Amino acid sequence: SSDIEMNRKELRQRTRDLYMNAPIGTAAIKATRTSCVGIGLKPKPKIDYEFLGISKEEAADIQRLIKKEFAIWAESTLCDICDLNNFYELQQIVFNDWLMNGEEFVLMAYGEKTSYMPYRLRLKLVTADRISTPGSLDGTYDGYDQTTKLGNRIMNGVEIDKDGKVV
């Protein structure tokens, strides 16, 4: 175990306190978030029209359609399983939480199609505080990792196999 694992709860508390109560802490996190995330991830399709045997014009039409269809999903709050934020806002939240907490998890789920949302993909954000090893529910590192029936280890709420791969 490292010093960070043993002190992560206290480190998160201090970072959040600085973010909420010290203007310089708030500015540092927000400026970093804005500089790194910017307007967010957007598709830039580049179709190899020669390989596909289509014209440049057909490829340009398909590229426009891809951007349009992505925007239908990304600009809607229905991309968020909680129906609160659009994809670009979720990116800002994830990066902000990562800076404050050291990690953030994004789960992919599938909802129902609707007449105004033809895509089922939904994203769920899980803050690092919600991830813990069974028995350490308050996020305090107790120095012990758990071993599963399959021989995998659970360390700080994340299950890994013998090679260190997250499972």
Q: What residue ranges belong to the model's regions?
A:
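Conserved small-residue
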Residues: 24-25, 40
